[in-house]
Amino acid sequence: MKKNVLAAAAVLAALAAFEHAASSARAADAAPTKLWEAQGLANPECALADTKAGVIYVSNVNGDAMGKDAKGYIAKVSLDGKKVEKWVDGLKAPKGLAISNGHLFTGDVDELVEIDIAAGKIVAKHKAPGAGLLNDVAADDKGNVYVSDTGGGGVFKLSGGKIEKWLDVPEAAGANGLAIEGGNLIVNTWGVLTGKGFETSSLGRMLSVSLADKKVTALDGGKTVGNLDGLASLGGGNYLISDWMAGKVMKFATGGKMEEVLDLGQGTADFGYDPDSKIIYVPQMMKNTLTAYKMQ
Protein backbone atom coordinates (compact mmCIF):
# COMPACT_ATOMS: atom_id res chain seq x y z
CA MET A 1 0.00 0.00 0.00
CA LYS A 2 2.77 2.39 1.00
CA LYS A 3 4.63 1.62 -2.23
CA ASN A 4 1.50 2.35 -4.26
CA VAL A 5 0.99 5.69 -2.51
CA LEU A 6 4.62 6.67 -3.07
CA ALA A 7 4.43 5.64 -6.72
CA ALA A 8 1.25 7.67 -7.22
CA ALA A 9 2.85 10.67 -5.56
CA ALA A 10 5.87 10.35 -7.83
CA VAL A 11 3.64 10.24 -10.91
CA LEU A 12 1.69 13.31 -9.79
CA ALA A 13 4.92 15.19 -9.10
CA ALA A 14 6.24 14.27 -12.53
CA LEU A 15 3.00 15.39 -14.19
CA ALA A 16 3.07 18.69 -12.30
CA ALA A 17 6.69 19.29 -13.34
CA PHE A 18 5.83 18.46 -16.95
CA GLU A 19 2.84 20.83 -16.97
CA HIS A 20 4.96 23.61 -15.44
CA ALA A 21 7.61 23.12 -18.11
CA ALA A 22 4.98 23.04 -20.85
CA SER A 23 3.34 26.17 -19.47
CA SER A 24 6.70 27.95 -19.37
CA ALA A 25 7.41 26.88 -22.94
CA ARG A 26 4.02 28.18 -24.10
CA ALA A 27 4.64 31.50 -22.36
CA ALA A 28 8.06 31.76 -24.01
CA ASP A 29 6.57 30.95 -27.41
CA ALA A 30 3.87 33.59 -26.92
CA ALA A 31 6.27 36.33 -25.81
CA PRO A 32 6.88 39.07 -28.41
CA THR A 33 10.28 39.04 -30.12
CA LYS A 34 12.31 42.25 -30.02
CA LEU A 35 13.31 43.25 -33.55
CA TRP A 36 15.15 46.53 -33.08
CA GLU A 37 15.44 49.68 -30.99
CA ALA A 38 15.85 53.18 -32.43
CA GLN A 39 17.64 55.87 -30.44
CA GLY A 40 17.88 59.63 -30.84
CA LEU A 41 14.29 60.63 -30.09
CA ALA A 42 13.09 63.23 -27.57
CA ASN A 43 10.28 62.07 -25.27
CA PRO A 44 8.51 60.15 -28.06
CA GLU A 45 4.80 59.89 -27.30
CA CYS A 46 3.10 58.26 -30.28
CA ALA A 47 4.15 56.01 -33.17
CA LEU A 48 2.14 55.52 -36.36
CA ALA A 49 3.37 53.09 -39.00
CA ASP A 50 2.61 53.79 -42.67
CA THR A 51 3.92 50.55 -44.14
CA LYS A 52 3.02 51.50 -47.73
CA ALA A 53 5.20 54.59 -47.46
CA GLY A 54 7.86 52.63 -45.57
CA VAL A 55 7.91 55.01 -42.62
CA ILE A 56 6.91 55.31 -38.98
CA TYR A 57 5.79 58.77 -37.84
CA VAL A 58 6.78 59.51 -34.25
CA SER A 59 5.61 62.52 -32.22
CA ASN A 60 8.28 63.98 -29.93
CA VAL A 61 7.18 66.10 -26.96
CA ASN A 62 10.78 67.16 -26.32
CA GLY A 63 10.17 68.50 -22.83
CA ASP A 64 7.06 69.38 -20.84
CA ALA A 65 4.01 67.35 -21.91
CA MET A 66 1.86 70.47 -21.50
CA GLY A 67 4.49 72.92 -22.74
CA LYS A 68 3.98 75.48 -25.49
CA ASP A 69 7.62 76.26 -26.22
CA ALA A 70 7.63 75.10 -29.88
CA LYS A 71 10.31 72.48 -29.18
CA GLY A 72 8.10 69.57 -30.18
CA TYR A 73 8.41 67.84 -33.53
CA ILE A 74 7.44 64.88 -35.68
CA ALA A 75 10.18 62.44 -36.67
CA LYS A 76 10.27 59.83 -39.40
CA VAL A 77 11.78 56.43 -38.60
CA SER A 78 12.46 53.74 -41.20
CA LEU A 79 10.66 50.42 -40.83
CA ASP A 80 13.94 48.74 -39.89
CA GLY A 81 14.68 51.38 -37.23
CA LYS A 82 18.01 52.31 -38.79
CA LYS A 83 17.10 55.81 -39.95
CA VAL A 84 15.72 58.54 -37.67
CA GLU A 85 15.17 62.05 -38.98
CA LYS A 86 13.43 65.16 -37.71
CA TRP A 87 10.67 65.95 -40.19
CA VAL A 88 8.24 68.68 -39.04
CA ASP A 89 9.18 70.94 -36.14
CA GLY A 90 7.85 74.04 -34.40
CA LEU A 91 5.16 72.13 -32.51
CA LYS A 92 4.27 72.58 -28.83
CA ALA A 93 4.17 69.06 -27.37
CA PRO A 94 2.65 66.76 -30.04
CA LYS A 95 1.09 63.47 -29.03
CA GLY A 96 -1.40 61.22 -30.88
CA LEU A 97 -1.24 60.75 -34.65
CA ALA A 98 -3.65 59.76 -37.42
CA ILE A 99 -3.68 59.96 -41.22
CA SER A 100 -6.67 61.10 -43.28
CA ASN A 101 -6.75 62.07 -46.97
CA GLY A 102 -3.01 62.52 -47.27
CA HIS A 103 -2.73 64.64 -44.15
CA LEU A 104 -1.19 63.74 -40.79
CA PHE A 105 -3.03 65.03 -37.72
CA THR A 106 -1.55 65.40 -34.25
CA GLY A 107 -3.00 66.49 -30.91
CA ASP A 108 -0.83 69.42 -29.80
CA VAL A 109 -1.87 70.67 -26.33
CA ASP A 110 -4.76 72.95 -27.37
CA GLU A 111 -4.68 72.53 -31.15
CA LEU A 112 -5.25 69.76 -33.65
CA VAL A 113 -2.39 70.31 -36.08
CA GLU A 114 -2.79 69.26 -39.72
CA ILE A 115 0.28 68.41 -41.81
CA ASP A 116 0.40 67.86 -45.58
CA ILE A 117 2.44 64.66 -45.80
CA ALA A 118 3.65 65.14 -49.38
CA ALA A 119 4.82 68.69 -48.69
CA GLY A 120 6.03 67.99 -45.16
CA LYS A 121 4.46 71.23 -43.97
CA ILE A 122 1.85 72.34 -41.45
CA VAL A 123 -1.22 73.51 -43.35
CA ALA A 124 -3.64 74.19 -40.49
CA LYS A 125 -3.87 74.51 -36.72
CA HIS A 126 -7.39 73.87 -35.46
CA LYS A 127 -7.78 75.56 -32.07
CA ALA A 128 -10.00 73.48 -29.79
CA PRO A 129 -12.07 75.81 -27.58
CA GLY A 130 -11.65 75.03 -23.88
CA ALA A 131 -9.30 72.10 -24.43
CA GLY A 132 -7.23 71.00 -21.43
CA LEU A 133 -4.67 68.74 -23.12
CA LEU A 134 -5.34 67.27 -26.55
CA ASN A 135 -3.89 63.82 -26.97
CA ASP A 136 -4.68 60.87 -29.22
CA VAL A 137 -6.20 61.12 -32.70
CA ALA A 138 -8.34 58.83 -34.86
CA ALA A 139 -9.97 59.32 -38.27
CA ASP A 140 -13.06 57.64 -39.69
CA ASP A 141 -13.71 56.68 -43.32
CA LYS A 142 -15.78 59.84 -43.87
CA GLY A 143 -12.84 62.13 -43.23
CA ASN A 144 -13.87 63.13 -39.72
CA VAL A 145 -11.00 63.42 -37.25
CA TYR A 146 -11.41 62.82 -33.50
CA VAL A 147 -8.99 63.99 -30.81
CA SER A 148 -9.15 63.12 -27.12
CA ASP A 149 -8.89 65.79 -24.43
CA THR A 150 -7.06 64.15 -21.55
CA GLY A 151 -6.85 67.40 -19.61
CA GLY A 152 -10.46 68.49 -20.02
CA GLY A 153 -12.17 65.16 -20.60
CA GLY A 154 -14.13 63.97 -23.60
CA VAL A 155 -13.42 64.10 -27.32
CA PHE A 156 -13.33 66.83 -29.96
CA LYS A 157 -14.32 66.26 -33.60
CA LEU A 158 -13.01 68.00 -36.71
CA SER A 159 -15.48 67.91 -39.59
CA GLY A 160 -15.58 70.14 -42.64
CA GLY A 161 -12.78 72.27 -41.22
CA LYS A 162 -14.67 72.99 -37.99
CA ILE A 163 -13.62 71.58 -34.62
CA GLU A 164 -16.02 71.26 -31.69
CA LYS A 165 -16.55 69.21 -28.53
CA TRP A 166 -18.22 66.00 -29.65
CA LEU A 167 -18.28 63.89 -26.49
CA ASP A 168 -18.51 65.33 -22.98
CA VAL A 169 -19.61 62.73 -20.45
CA PRO A 170 -18.29 61.75 -16.99
CA GLU A 171 -17.22 58.30 -18.19
CA ALA A 172 -14.75 59.92 -20.61
CA ALA A 173 -12.86 61.88 -17.95
CA GLY A 174 -9.18 61.78 -18.88
CA ALA A 175 -9.95 60.42 -22.37
CA ASN A 176 -6.76 59.24 -24.03
CA GLY A 177 -6.33 56.44 -26.58
CA LEU A 178 -8.72 56.36 -29.56
CA ALA A 179 -9.47 53.78 -32.25
CA ILE A 180 -12.20 53.52 -34.87
CA GLU A 181 -13.88 50.11 -34.88
CA GLY A 182 -16.75 49.80 -37.31
CA GLY A 183 -19.42 52.29 -36.29
CA ASN A 184 -17.85 52.95 -32.90
CA LEU A 185 -15.08 55.03 -31.42
CA ILE A 186 -13.15 53.01 -28.86
CA VAL A 187 -11.85 55.21 -26.04
CA ASN A 188 -9.51 54.38 -23.22
CA THR A 189 -8.94 56.87 -20.43
CA TRP A 190 -6.12 57.95 -18.17
CA GLY A 191 -8.45 58.29 -15.19
CA VAL A 192 -10.02 61.10 -13.19
CA LEU A 193 -7.37 63.80 -12.75
CA THR A 194 -6.96 65.41 -9.32
CA GLY A 195 -5.51 68.64 -10.68
CA LYS A 196 -2.01 67.75 -9.49
CA GLY A 197 -0.20 67.01 -12.73
CA PHE A 198 -1.22 63.61 -14.06
CA GLU A 199 -2.21 62.19 -10.66
CA THR A 200 -5.60 60.45 -10.64
CA SER A 201 -8.23 59.80 -8.00
CA SER A 202 -9.41 56.74 -9.94
CA LEU A 203 -7.87 54.77 -12.78
CA GLY A 204 -8.92 54.76 -16.41
CA ARG A 205 -11.64 52.89 -18.25
CA MET A 206 -12.28 51.13 -21.57
CA LEU A 207 -15.30 52.47 -23.47
CA SER A 208 -17.08 52.13 -26.80
CA VAL A 209 -18.92 55.17 -28.17
CA SER A 210 -21.39 54.95 -31.05
CA LEU A 211 -20.45 57.33 -33.86
CA ALA A 212 -24.13 57.59 -34.75
CA ASP A 213 -25.69 58.60 -31.43
CA LYS A 214 -22.75 58.85 -28.97
CA LYS A 215 -24.13 56.07 -26.79
CA VAL A 216 -21.41 55.01 -24.34
CA THR A 217 -20.92 51.32 -23.57
CA ALA A 218 -18.49 50.11 -20.92
CA LEU A 219 -16.13 47.42 -22.19
CA ASP A 220 -14.51 46.91 -18.79
CA GLY A 221 -17.48 45.55 -16.86
CA GLY A 222 -17.56 48.75 -14.83
CA LYS A 223 -14.06 48.18 -13.44
CA THR A 224 -11.13 50.57 -13.66
CA VAL A 225 -8.17 49.35 -15.68
CA GLY A 226 -5.12 51.63 -15.41
CA ASN A 227 -3.54 54.91 -16.54
CA LEU A 228 -4.25 54.00 -20.14
CA ASP A 229 -2.56 55.43 -23.21
CA GLY A 230 -1.99 53.31 -26.34
CA LEU A 231 -4.89 51.49 -28.00
CA ALA A 232 -5.35 49.19 -30.99
CA SER A 233 -8.27 46.97 -31.96
CA LEU A 234 -7.51 43.29 -32.55
CA GLY A 235 -11.09 42.43 -33.50
CA GLY A 236 -13.56 40.16 -31.77
CA GLY A 237 -13.80 42.42 -28.73
CA ASN A 238 -10.06 42.24 -28.06
CA TYR A 239 -7.61 45.13 -27.83
CA LEU A 240 -4.01 46.02 -27.22
CA ILE A 241 -3.60 48.73 -24.60
CA SER A 242 -0.74 50.34 -22.71
CA ASP A 243 -0.60 51.56 -19.13
CA TRP A 244 1.84 54.49 -19.09
CA MET A 245 2.44 54.53 -15.33
CA ALA A 246 2.73 50.76 -14.91
CA GLY A 247 4.87 50.56 -18.04
CA LYS A 248 2.99 47.64 -19.56
CA VAL A 249 1.40 46.61 -22.84
CA MET A 250 -1.56 44.28 -22.33
CA LYS A 251 -4.20 42.38 -24.23
CA PHE A 252 -7.65 43.43 -23.05
CA ALA A 253 -10.83 41.44 -23.68
CA THR A 254 -14.29 42.97 -23.46
CA GLY A 255 -15.52 42.30 -19.93
CA GLY A 256 -12.21 43.17 -18.31
CA LYS A 257 -9.94 40.14 -18.69
CA MET A 258 -6.31 41.20 -19.25
CA GLU A 259 -3.09 39.46 -20.23
CA GLU A 260 0.34 41.09 -19.94
CA VAL A 261 2.25 41.25 -23.22
CA LEU A 262 5.24 43.47 -22.39
CA ASP A 263 6.65 45.01 -19.20
CA LEU A 264 8.91 47.86 -20.33
CA GLY A 265 8.89 50.36 -17.48
CA GLN A 266 7.18 53.67 -16.84
CA GLY A 267 6.67 55.84 -19.90
CA THR A 268 5.37 53.11 -22.21
CA ALA A 269 3.29 55.36 -24.42
CA ASP A 270 1.02 55.39 -27.48
CA PHE A 271 2.27 52.47 -29.57
CA GLY A 272 1.60 51.82 -33.23
CA TYR A 273 0.42 48.38 -34.33
CA ASP A 274 0.50 46.88 -37.82
CA PRO A 275 -2.01 44.00 -37.95
CA ASP A 276 -0.61 42.59 -41.21
CA SER A 277 2.92 42.02 -39.90
CA LYS A 278 1.83 41.81 -36.24
CA ILE A 279 4.56 44.26 -35.32
CA ILE A 280 4.06 46.70 -32.45
CA TYR A 281 6.14 49.90 -32.35
CA VAL A 282 6.48 51.13 -28.77
CA PRO A 283 7.69 54.65 -27.90
CA GLN A 284 9.39 54.95 -24.52
CA MET A 285 9.03 58.55 -23.35
CA MET A 286 11.49 58.24 -20.47
CA LYS A 287 14.12 56.36 -22.47
CA ASN A 288 13.86 58.37 -25.72
CA THR A 289 13.56 55.20 -27.79
CA LEU A 290 11.23 53.47 -30.22
CA THR A 291 11.29 49.67 -30.09
CA ALA A 292 9.72 47.18 -32.50
CA TYR A 293 8.41 43.81 -31.33
CA LYS A 294 6.99 40.94 -33.35
CA MET A 295 3.79 39.66 -31.78
CA GLN A 296 3.09 35.92 -31.77
Q: Where on the chain are the PLM-derived regions?
A:
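Bacterial N-terminal signal peptides that target proteins for export
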Residues: 1-9
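C-terminal segment of classical bacterial N-terminal signal peptides
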Residues: 15-24
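A short beta-strand motif characteristic of beta-propeller blades
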Residues: 32-38, 82-88, 121-127, 163-168, ...
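Beta-rich, blade/repeat-based domains predominating
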Residues: 41-53, 64, 68-71, 88-105, ...
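Beta-propeller domains
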Residues: 59-79
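A short loop-to-beta-strand structural motif that recurs across blades of beta-propeller domains
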Residues: 72-75, 111-113, 154-156, 205-207, ...
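Short loop/turn segments that connect beta-strands within beta-propeller blades
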Residues: 78-82, 116-121, 158-162, 210-214, ...
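Glycine/small-residue-rich hydrophobic helix-like segments
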Residues: 201-260
